[in-house]
Amino acid sequence: MSMRGSMRRSHLRQVSAASLDSVSSRSVDTAQHDALQLSDHPSSSDGKTYKFSSTGLDRRQCSLWVHDETFSKEEILFNQAAFADTGVRDGDLIEILSARTVVDGPSSGQSQSHSFNLAVKPDMRTRSMRDVHGHGHSHVETASSSRSHAMSKFKTPLQTRCLFIAKPLPNEIRTKHPKLELSVTSSVANIFGFKNRSTVYISIVEQTQCAASHVDISFRDQFLVRSDMWRLVMSELAGKIVYKGQKIVFMGSIKATVKNIFIRGKKVLSGFFSPQTIPVFRSESAKYVLFIQMSREMWDFDSEGTGDILFSRVINGFLPELFKRWANADARHLVTIVLFTRVEYDASITGLPSTLNSENLKNTSEPNHAPTRDFYRVVVNDMASGHWTTILDELKKDFRTFLRDVSILKVPEDPVASTSASTTPKATIGGRPSTALRGNILEAIHLASSHLAFDHIDRDMVHTGTSIIVITPGSGVFEVSYESLASTTEALTNRGIAIDLVCLSPMPLHSVPLFKYREPNRGGRSSFSYGGDIQGGGYSPEMRHPFASLTNRTHFSPKSTFSSTSPASGPRGPWTRANDWSYGIPHWLDISYWNPETYRESRRILKKDPNAPIPFTVTKKSKLFKSRVRMYEIQMGGVMESEQSNISIPYLLEDQITSRSLNVPPKTSFRRNSHFNHQLSDSLRPGSFLGNMTNPKETILSRSRSASATAAWMDNYDDNVFRSFSKRNHRRKQTKPKRPSEPEVQVSTTHDRLSARSITHLREHETKPNEWPRKEAAPKIPATKAVSPRKPALKAPSKTKVPRISRTISFALRGLGVAPPRAQASTEVNVEHATGLPSSNTKRSAGSLRESKSIESLSAASDSTSTATVVEASPMPSTPPRQRKSPTITPSRPISIRVPLKTPIEDSDQPTRSVAESFGTNGADLPITEKASLEHQTRKSIPRFELTTSPGLRESSAKNLQSRLLAPWVRSINPCNTPREVSRDTSWFGRWQHAYPRPPHVAVVKWKSLKSPAVLPLTTEEFPTASELASDYLQTPYRVFPNDDAEGIEAPKTTGLLMREMISLRLSHGFQIVVGNNVVEASGRYALRSPNVFDTQTLEMDGATVFLSKGHSIHRLVCTGGNEIEVTRFVHRSLSDLVSEKKNGLDIVYSLAMRTIMSREYDIKHINLRSSAEEYNWNYADNYIAGHRDYLFNPAQQLHFWRVRFVLIPVRLHVHARRHMQPINEDNEEEIHLLGINQLTLIWQRHKYVPPEEKRIETSSKSRDQNPLNILYQTRNPSEVVAAELNLLADPGLESSPAQLLPESELLERSSISLSSLAQIVQSDKGVRMMDRRWHWRLHYNCFIGSEFTTWLCQNFRDIETREEAVEFGNKLLELNLFQHVEQRHKFRDGNYFYQISSEYRVARPESRNSWFPQIRPDKSIPSTPATADNWKDSPLSAHSRSASVDQNAPQTPTTPSRSKSKASVMLSKTLKYDVDPRKRSNRPEVIDLHYDRLHNPDNCFHIELSWMNTTPKLIEDTVQSWAATAEKFGLKLVQVPIAEASAIDQTQPFRQPYRVKLKVPPPKGPSSTIFNAASFSQQDAPDPHYFQKLILKKFDFVLDFEARSAFPPDVEVGYSWGRPDYRYSQYIHQSGTLLVQITDEGDFLVLANRLVSTRTVPFTGTRDRDHRARAGYDPMGTIERDRLSPRLSPLVRPIHDIAGPASPMAHSSLDSASLYRAPEHVLHGFEEFCNDPVRLGQLYSESFVYPVSAKAAPTTASCVDSSIPSLELPAPVIGHHISPPPGTPVRPETRTRAASTSANGSLPLIDPRSRQREESSVARGSPRSASIML
């Protein structure tokens, strides 16, 4: 976080980028004096004083060796025997110092210990004593060449010393090397600059002296939850020595590196990790969302620098620098870039949509705001950071058209009509971007963080952390609404992310980043109400005293409130109370300022330019004045070229504000938060000036009336300005107050000059000097003739000639009004007037001014609410009306006069009464009597209060709900006078306070955060007081105890383990462990001491108490003595209100216009910005961890399990892959795919989680060798199988493995069984299942499956222990001709292979056994069917084959079950507990829920879903990688895909939406289905409405992923183990895994890129040459996987060669892809090109009727280049041998491969894959049977 203005005493904070931490801000003499004082007793970081160890080992000289890992794996070997005289013991902390460091160190007159252990004061902003000490004694590194480059930053012994803990030397090494004293590994020697056999000095040091305060730990290419970080620290770091560059390996899988170590704010090379050390984890593989605010200033020119527009700073400066730093750090981030802006429209545009104004979260401006709309343009989404050139190219292209696209308004704007070809909306340029000040920055941030609510779904397993960078052309000040600030703050706080804000404008003169907001006016405060309809511009005369009841909620100085009395605030008076500006600095926002010149110098330093500035030094500041504000109109008006160029220029916009108050009605004059009033850092340009005016026409008219009077008054003022005070005072007493506002300049200071307030007060009564005396007795004035309450109406323009100097000023500055620059008094004159005031009142006024840092340096009319709390605390007595009209009040402290609830009647008769009647100036122009009266009144009614923020004010302001919601996440401050002591408070940084080892600078770019964002720290000190905890929080206690009776559950068995798991769960959900004194004081009876959160033994003790916090929620966990854990949840009352509002549906709906990557135009979206108010049921979660799980129906959704989904996509099996599969070379491609799935199921079964108690009971290895997954393989889609063979899926026998049917006494033995008896047993009821089975077009009678027979042999043979033995015995039986393969192609195999009993052993049956059991039970629900032949009766499989011969005109028969009225239910997937840690590397069970398909079609995807609650993700990632490597050997690609369907992606990821592709030519009605279906007994299936769409998808290598819910029969309840299918459309996925496609009901395609695919890559085992890649076709993964494990993460992903093979449909388009990111676009390009080609579509439609094919999308086989291969037609006997084709079905030609059917012109494939495989088998084997029986 940035030091929002607190780093320097002055608020004029100009800090050079070279002011680094090592630069001293103190004198050397003072530092040396402090060093002498601290040398004897150095102090620790907590201020305590420690004495040095009295041990004898103090700077002992020894010889250091350097060894490698072959010598010893220990990093440091220390021989204690060589130092026996020193009393060194095991566990002592020893430091090693190079002899060179000691020699070059301090003089010998001082103790060496002093140089090693010098301490510093706790103030880390002052220079370290160690640095100063070394500086004063020439303690510099002279031999830098011998050190590494990193050593150049470490100058003192404390920073360069090497620490280690003494431990015994192994006996073997001690025996072999008795002379060894000290030895370090080569890696340690390189870090510290040690040389082999060199001399070093060792000393024993205290742990407190070398304990690290912070340790930066970086990691990449892995997803780590914060609970894993906590466990890593406890296991690998706590109580150990850490050093820079140290490699950390946790559980053999999680890898991290120590980047930086800090001791008392200084970087060191090594340190001790104490219980108070704070680990800071930083991710080098994060997801970055870069928001670029395209506000109006982006197109402004940089007049001070190169003259480019500000956007050039982004595209040519900041972003290239950022990408270069990423590349240098080898960071592998994913980048999303979004351009956003808020467009303001002119309300006068005819036909403006009435809903346009509601397209915002909340109106952030005044009541009469202009209609606005927020626009978002997604440039890139999740692109690898290494492709930065591509990112910049895309950004430049979008910038060219961005302004045009957002400025055009279509009237009327009808989304339906705009997309229609018949209606062309009228396009007009109706808007312009708003300024950065009034942009939609909070809405953009909230939108980006909204997807984190679904962070547990579709978890990316190789990236950790989300960082949001906002690049703005502004200076860090934003006007926002209170509601948006509160909701965004609450969302970011609960989700644990921080924002980096990069400003392109110079840093302003106040604290930043700053949010201006107006707190809402809640009910119940009638005196504060608007008094009228604000939105309608209502005005209530009763509320004309706006300052009477102010409430200080923002802890500003009273000075800031006085801005409300500016001339522009006159008509706004009634609403000033509710609309006073509040200023807040959020702790979740880090601000940086990009200065191109600074980083040009840094580049020169890196390039070793001799003229570059010296590093680590401060360049002497130039004394030349450097302007902070450029006034474009003054520069262009020729003022500076005139003879008066040495005079003061007019104040900014003073006349415009004053004049606009004259005649503008209250509704239109309420413009206090305009951009030109506030943002001083940006120069005013013509566009921005005119665009912010409410009504320029009114301003011009008002100026013409006041021109002459203004000039005359200024001339008179010039005559008086140099008169002595006494003369002027005497003159004023004589002539009465002719210039009531003239003395305003007397108390004006430099701060007032910043705000243009002085000149406006000087001119407020310039035309009516005697206005006030008449005003008191003035009669009622009609409201229609009301003039400004702040400035009375001016006379008509005088005919006297205006002085010449008045006409030399450009009218552009003030809206064509005169502005004589001579009117300004110099600063010296102002000071003179201020000191010349009478002492009676000057003391108070000047004193307040000296203390005040005027808030009006922000703006001329910026409002505040500073006097509110004081007024409420000390009510002022009511004064008579005449006293209330007193015109004189000190300008530095405006009086707040309380208005009685019952306003006097006479007050309501004065609607035009001037504010000056209540607030004037105390000057010499008033009578002495009035001044004395006012002074007395001021002293009596105004309490004295300080200008700084105090805890008392903070606490009092937090009494209202609005402040409590923001505090402490947004600090209310006075931005122009932020106290140093307030900003030094560690709580200033909120939840991120422990991420900063030292306070950051504002003026420099936070590269550390931008390069590697920090993860939310594990610990925090943010905690409420005991009283707040008791009064403001609701408590919910409950108890949790381990479930001792949990069977088969990986539940913790002890209270200590349960405690750790509960803490881990909360850490992974964004909680932080609370440490520090606050929690100790607030914990009451548990207040023993802050526990060591990194010590497991401490946490497991009885009575151990741990507090965890997250936003407004606090959890207290207490280990009780009764084997229980007491949990108390503290929820803030305001948060409970938010939860109740959320339940009532009060979430914010944000309407915006967004254009995603592939969209052609902006679409209106309505996004529900869900409140992150906590709804998580922690009671259920804790009990689930403890093992109580019976009460949860769907824990994965109820408890927000982490969930990821994978699919196994069948791809072409390459020839080279077959070489490594010699045993299965006889299998075809489809069989190999199923064999791969079978191999995975064997792995799953092998690593199935078995509780330890079950392992002890388990005695038989047979049960372990079983494979009970029982996946049913079918060649039809699941919906077809459900409709046709429901009884098969509902059969309970399929749910589990066949039971052991033979009793133990009747078990068989291989040596004593005969073939005939075995054949009888196998075919009996106790034998293996035999039934009729169909595969593709063929039906096989009375056969069994090899895998089931293998299981049967293991169960029923006493002497068969393993499945391998069963397969061996089965092959012997096959050789003996007991059974044979149905096609006689395979030996006996353990898989999905079909076998039949030989005819000589076959038992005759009256009917075919065609189900799992001998007969179907009469109570089973089956579809109603007509009577058929005996051979086909009751057989769903045979009936399915028979359906094609049924007459089309046959009467339709309902297919609903005839015996049951309730729906039948069927589960299409199963689940098991899988152990991802079989090697037991973790100290806890690592178990996940593995869901897999129960029914699978080998042509489709095989689905896998993983869910877990508290398991280590890195172990899951390693497991999935091993699965992917196994599947890749069998032609299966494991790809991660989103859980939700593609059409719903925008519900979880706001910056993505599917791309719609339409067919240029609507397809004709598809042919009737020719697939045999059991539901077609008496009817012909209706034509598939999406037949041709599926055909096109199959042509482009798409395979079926999930079917739509509507595809399943409505009378069947279909479910999965992970939930019910909810897909609206059927979804297909490309074989590369990069593209998802859905077919809508209208027949359109919804296309979405799968951005998760490239995180799931596996290095190939074999080498692939170019020919192989050509045959592989489109395989973008293959060419880069061998180069890097995760190409998506690589900053330099190599180009993809031959991305489209010759057989691929995209082969005809030239492809020059540079990254995997482009792969989906190339697939989409060819796909969309085909859909838009009428000729190719027509050819496809016509050919499909000649040769109808199955519309089922299926994979292709090996590619074939030649399209001239003649299509081979299967002979009729081959087909007729199995089944006759249905009547009327044309003979379909077959080809050798699918790819051969794709001709060069993209004609349709002419082959059904099932027939293709039969033909392949016939050619290859020469068998008369051509059908391929799978596995």
UniProtKB/Swiss-Prot annotation:
Q: Where is the composition biased (Low complexity)?
A: 855-874
Q: Name one GO cellular component term.
A: vacuolar membrane
> In which residue ranges is the amino acid composition biased (Basic and acidic residues)?
130-140, 750-778, 1809-1818
Where along the chain is composition biased (Basic residues)?
725-738
Q: Which keywords does this Swiss-Prot/TrEMBL entry list?
A: Membrane, Vacuole
**Gene Ontology biological process:** intracellular signal transduction; negative regulation of TORC1 signaling; positive regulation of autophagy
Chain spans, region Disordered: 31-52, 130-150, 724-801, 820-924, 1412-1467, 1772-1831
CDD domains to which the protein is assigned, alphabetical: DEP_DEPDC5-like
The record, for InterPro entries, names:
DEP_dom (IPR000591), DEPDC5_CTD (IPR045838), IML1 (IPR027244), IML1_N (IPR048255), WH-like_DNA-bd_sf (IPR036388), WH_DNA-bd_sf (IPR036390)
Q: Which residues form the DEP domain?
A: 1324-1399
Q: How does it sit in the membrane?
A: Peripheral membrane protein
Q: Read off the SMART domains from this record.
A: DEP (SM00049)
- Which residue ranges have biased composition labelled Polar residues? 40-52, 911-921, 1438-1459
What is the annotated localization of this protein? Vacuole membrane
Task: Please provide, alphabetically and separated by semicolons, the GO molecular function terms listed in this UniProt record.
Answer: GTPase activator activity
According to its UniProt record, which protein family does this protein belong to? Belongs to the IML1 family.
Protein name per UniProt:
Vacuolar membrane-associated protein iml1
Organism annotation: Emericella nidulans (strain FGSC A4 / ATCC 38163 / CBS 112.46 / NRRL 194 / M139)
Instruction: State the gene name recorded for this protein.
Output: iml1
